[in-house]
Amino acid sequence: MYMIESKGGAIACMLLALLFLGTWPAIMTLTERRGRLPQHTYLDYTLTNLLAAVIIALTLGEIGPSRPNFFTQLSQDNWQSVMFAMAGGIVLSLGNLATQYAWAYVGLSVTEVITASITVVIGTTLNYFLDDRINRAEVLFPGVACFLIAVCFGSAVHKSNAADNKTKLQNFKSLETTSSFEMETISASNGLTKGKAKEGTAAFLIELEKQRAIKVFGKSTIIGLVITFFAGICFSLFSPAFNLATNDQWHTLKHGVPKLNVYTAFFYFSISAFVVALILNIRFLYWPILGLPRSSFKAYLNDWNGRGWSFLAGFLCGFGNGLQFMGGQAAGYAAADAVQALPLVSTFWGILLFGEYRRSSRKTYTLLISMLLMFIVAVAVLMASSGHRK
C-alpha cells in the first residue's frame, strides 16, 4: 500500500480534501434549489461515495512496498477495529443526511460554519489526546480558538443577513395571501425582469421558494438549527472513531494482528455509511419528512434531472474523506481537522452560485469578510500544528 510519510505530503492531502469537502455541499444544494427531491439526490450521492472508497482501496491500498495491503487485511482477525471504522461511517452518514435538510433552512454557509465549529471543538480535542499529543498544543489550541472566533462572526453574519432579507420581504405579507396580479406587480418592483429575478432581491427569494424542493417560508429556523447541531455532533465523532480504527489506542486487537491501514478502514467506513444512507433514504421515499412529497423507488430510478451533479458530489465527498484520513494518519488527525475550514469553500460557492449575501448591508459584508479572514488564519494554524506519527 502507498503511505504518506512526509509532512508536506500530508498538508497537500489536507488542502485537496478541503477543496473537495467544501464543494460537494454546494452541488447538493444546487440540485435541491432546482427542485430535485433530496432523497433522490442522496441515493445517487451515496453510490459514488462508496465507489470512491473502493477505487482508493484497490489502487493506493495495493501499490507500494508497505504492508499489509488492502486484500490481505480483509481476511485478518481485526473485527474490533472494523467496528470502530463502521461506527465512524454510520455517524458521518447521519450527519451528511441531516445537513442536506439543514442547508435549506439556515443556508449553506451558516450550516457549514456551525457543524464545523462543533467538529473542531469536540473532534479535534478527542483526536489530540487519542494521537498521544503528537500535535503541538501551543499551536493547535490557538487554532481552535481562531475557529471559534470565526464561528462567532458566522453567527453574526447569519443574523445580519436574515435582517436584510426581512427588510427585502417587508412588502410581502405571505405567499399564500398574495394574488397572482399583486405578485407580478411587486416582483417587478423588486428586481424581476423578463421572468428572471435578480440575485439578492425579494423577487429572487420568492422565485427560489417556488422552485426548490424543500419549502422553508413561514417555517421556524429552529428546526434547521436543531438539525444542524445534531449533524455537528455526528461529524465530531466520525474522525476519532476512524482514528481508533487505524491506530488501536485502546489495544482491542489480539497480539500480533496488524492495525487496520487507512485504506481498509476507509472501505469498511464507507460500507456502513452506504448501508445507513440506503435504508434511511428508501424509507424517506415512501414516508418523507419536513413536508416533502412522497416518492417511490421507481420514480427515483426515472429521475435523471441532476443525477450527474449528484454523482459528482458523491465522488468529491468520498475522495475528500479519503484524503483527509491519509493526511491524518501521517500528520495527526487533530491537524487533519483543518479541513473543517471547508466553510471557506462553501461560502465561496454560496456567493458565486446561489447569490448568497447579494445586495446585503455593509454590516453583513464586513462581518462576512471578517469570518473568512479568521477561517484562513484558523486553517493555517491548525496545519502548522502538524506532527509526525512514529
From Swiss-Prot:
InterPro entries: UPS_plant, Ureide_permease. Residues 31-44, 100-101, 158-221, 283-307, 355-363 are cytoplasmic. Optimum pH is 4.75. Keywords: ATP-binding, Membrane, Nucleotide-binding, Transmembrane, Transmembrane helix, Transport. The chain crosses the membrane at residues 10-30, 45-65, 79-99, 102-122, 137-157, 222-242, 262-282, 308-328, 334-354, 364-384. Residues 1-9, 66-78, 123-136, 243-261, 329-333, 385-390 are extracellular. GO terms for biological process: allantoin transport; pyrimidine nucleobase salvage; uracil transport. One of its GO terms (cellular component) is membrane. One of its GO terms (molecular function) is allantoin:proton symporter activity. It is a multi-pass membrane protein. It is found in: Membrane. ATP binds at residues 213-220. Induction: By nitrogen deficiency. Expressed in leaves, flowers, roots and stems. Belongs to the plant ureide permease (TC 2.A.7.19) family. Proton-coupled transporter that transports a wide spectrum of oxo derivatives of heterocyclic nitrogen compounds, including allantoin, uric acid and xanthine, but not adenine. Mediates high affinity transport of uracil and 5-fluorouracil (a toxic uracil analog). Mediates transport of free pyrimidines and may function during early seedling development in salvage pathways, by the utilization of pyrimidines from seed storage tissue. PANTHER family: UREIDE PERMEASE 1-RELATED, UREIDE PERMEASE 1-RELATED-RELATED. This is Ureide permease 1.
